[in-house]
């Protein structure tokens, strides 16, 4: 793990921070840490009694407004966090800390109900039966144009069975193909270095390939305009470690030689929960 000293979207060096909590499931999954109760019989002179949680820091970039966790996890830690992601063992472990997760997870595994909205957004950007690569697409259940794409390839480390009509590909196989559409949906909010991911994705794109990028438009960003108030409101961190602004997304895309051709923020429902997402159509710049 590293502690971020610069913005992970625009590389700005002016960051403002506030103390926060790393949620118990994430702390346990990553480091084996659990909350502990400090009792009177500990005899701690300078430490108050109560439950001690895992501490971290919320950071905000003064330039692009990205709100993010200071902890940047390495590949081994990320593998531990997402091992068996949404599978039985993962769900059981998370249910222990977050009662009710298993029921919501079952809804998430069934797929989202707003795929038609995304396909409509992409209709003018890709052919009617596009060749699609879903980068980080898990089983492919949420891939736009699923069931009518000319090709439905999935590049993902999860190893979960894929939906009918899709195939899992490795990096070499994907790089040997030509795609009309590359999808990266609800991925980069989880990763330590989103610019690196977007640069990697750009390698799979040709000059006429469209990228569909989707990330949460988190309520704390969407509903709180004043930066200081927004930072103060972000007191805990879970699996989403990057809360994006439009400016942060533009900066991250630019670092990969990509530019947004269209961007909308709109309401969605997934896993029985209402939220907002940024939907972005991007292409290689120039």
Predicted regions and their residues:
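Short alpha-helix
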Residues: 240-256
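Conserved N-terminal segment of class I S-adenosyl-L-methionine
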Residues: 1-185, 194-198, 204, 212, ...
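Extracytoplasmic/secreted proteins and extracellular or luminal domains
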Residues: 175, 256-257
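Conserved beta-strand signature within the Rossmann-like core of class I S-adenosyl-L-methionine
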Residues: 208-217
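Short "lid" loop at the C-terminus of a central beta-strand within the Rossmann-like core
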Residues: 22, 216-222, 242, 267
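Flexible internal linker/loop segments at domain or repeat junctions
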Residues: 221-229
